[in-house]
């Protein structure tokens, strides 16, 4: 069988849905979603101790900022900082993640297969940054791939009241690129 575990990093940080609107968690963006990565490692720790879960078959999937956690959980530097030695996800499925931040050693990843899914028309996060990141990882021989869905936006699988929606107003990182200061430890 398959078991699922839903991790809600946003509510723990004071960001909750209000009625049918989503409240943006500004702290997630201020720190480029890095706080969600340790959350993903703690979920892996918890799941790996469950007697009915095979710790070698746990995958991670995240959406938007959560997709960033799913994507970068395989970065060896972050695993060393926040992960548990010897414990790794079996697969990663980031859904429309922000790939527009470059971190030190972010191309030094584990052998976790990564499959990114993005919408061609996503204006929240630049799709080209995910394509470029995947190219860097493939050049290192990693098992990574990206699926770009034509004519789709950020949050393409989401529905409100059974209808496809797309919000043009709100936080938009679409033309921003970030790079970690290489002089920091």
PLM region descriptions:
Residues 123-132:
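Conserved alpha/beta-hydrolase "acid-adjacent" motif
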């Amino acid at each position: 069988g398959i078991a699922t575990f839903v991790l809600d990093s946003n509510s723990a940080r004071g960001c909750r849905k209000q009625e049918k609107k989503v409240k943006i968690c500004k702290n997630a963006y201020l720190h480029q979603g890095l706080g969600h990565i340790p959350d993903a490692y703690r979920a892996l720790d918890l799941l790996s101790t469950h007697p009915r879960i095979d710790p070698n078959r746990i995958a991670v999937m995240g959406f938007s900022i959560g997709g960033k956690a799913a994507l970068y959980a395989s970065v060896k530097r972050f695993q060393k900082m926040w992960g548990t030695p010897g414990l790794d996800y079996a697969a990663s499925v980031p859904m429309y993640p922000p790939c527009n931040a470059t971190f030190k050693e972010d191309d030094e990843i584990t052998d976790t297969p990564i499959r990114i899914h993005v919408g061609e028309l996503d204006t929240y996060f630049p799709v080209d940054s995910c394509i470029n990141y995947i190219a860097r990882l493939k050049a290192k021989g990693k098992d990574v791939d990206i699926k770009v869905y034509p004519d789709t936006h950020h949050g393409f699988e989401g529905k409100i009241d059974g209808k496809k929606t797309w919000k043009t107003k709100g936080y938009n990182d679409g033309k921003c690129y970030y790079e970690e200061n290489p002089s920091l430890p």
